[in-house]
Amino acid sequence: MLLNTLSPAAGSKHAPKRLGRGVGSGLGKTGGRGHKGQKSRSGGKVRPGFEGGQMPLKQRLPKFGFTSRKSFVSAEVRLSELAKVTGDVVDLNALKAANLVTKNIEFAKIVLSGEINKAVTVKGLRVTKGAKAAIEAAGGKIEE
């Protein structure tokens, strides 16, 4: 096989439409754009979501919901990630030092995901039931 003999498989490539090249081509004169109107002009297009002056669907449907501002300062930490914390005490500052949560986080919750091998003391963090059972089974404890 030589590089200069390579060619695409037969029928896999299509020649581009040649617009405005005579009436015999079927795409002469107006080039498949029809007669007059905004879409026949060069640069003529309507913005996404425009429905010809009718009230658009996006505006016909009601607004709903909101984003809680508390979600920006809250985080979940997996049980398996606690292995990255140096030391036996896990609190918010220890999580920040281990880069498990960002500096703007004020509330963290430990959730049961993965396993924990070392005994740790969790201070001042919320813990799910399953995570609490797993921490205590590993010899750790939870302090409020």
Curated annotation (Swiss-Prot):
Region entry Disordered, spans: 1-57
Pfam families: Ribosomal_L27A
Record-level GO BP terms: translation
Skewed-composition ranges (Gly residues): 21-31
Keyword terms, alphabetized: Ribonucleoprotein, Ribosomal protein, RNA-binding, rRNA-binding
Biased amino acid composition, Basic residues: 32-44
GO cellular component: cytosolic large ribosomal subunit
Gene Ontology molecular function terms on file: rRNA binding; structural constituent of ribosome
Assembly and oligomerization: Part of the 50S ribosomal subunit.
Sequence similarity: Belongs to the universal ribosomal protein uL15 family.
Annotated function: Binds to the 23S rRNA.
HAMAP family, A to Z: Ribosomal_uL15
Name of this chain's protein: Large ribosomal subunit protein uL15
Species: Vibrio cholerae serotype O1 (strain ATCC 39315 / El Tor Inaba N16961)
